[in-house]
Amino acid sequence: MPKIPQMKYTVYLFDFDYTLADSSRGIVTCFRSVLERHGYTGITDDMIKRTIGKTLEESFSILTGITDADQLESFRQEYSKEADIYMNANTILFPDTLPTLTHLKKQGIRIGIISTKYRFRILSFLRNHMPDDWFDIIIGGED
C-alpha cells in the first residue's frame, strides 16, 4: 500500500460557533426574543439552531418566510441589541478548545477564526477566556 505523505500545516482557520464555542443558548435566546416580539411563536429551538452559521438575515428569512430586505435588516438590528445583553453570558468554549489551540500555538502554528458571527462579539467573548494576541486573525460577519 502506498504511503500517504503527512502534511504539516502552518495555519489553521476555525469557525467560531459549533467549532470553538457553543453559543446556541445565546443565539436561541436572542432569536426567540425578536421572533416572539413580532408574533412568531411556533418556531422551535431546533429550527433556530439549524440556521446557525447563516447570516442573521438569511436565518430570519428561513424562520419567518420574510424576504423584504428592510424588514430583515430591522430584525438583524433588534437581534444585535439582544445579543449585547445575552450572547457572551450564554456562550461557552468546548472542553477541547483551549487544549487544542494551546497545542497548536506551542508548535508555532498560526491560528485564526472566520465566522458569520460579528468580529467585535467574538473579541468581546475571547477577552474573558484567552490572551488578546492568541489569534493571528479574526474575520467576522461585518468584514
Predicted regions span which residues?
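N-terminal helical cap/lid subdomain that shapes the substrate entry/recognition surface
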Residues: 7-99, 103, 107, 120
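Residues at the starts of beta-strands that form the adenosine-phosphate
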Residues: 110
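Substrate-recognition "cap/lid" segment bordering the active-site pocket of phosphatases
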Residues: 118-143
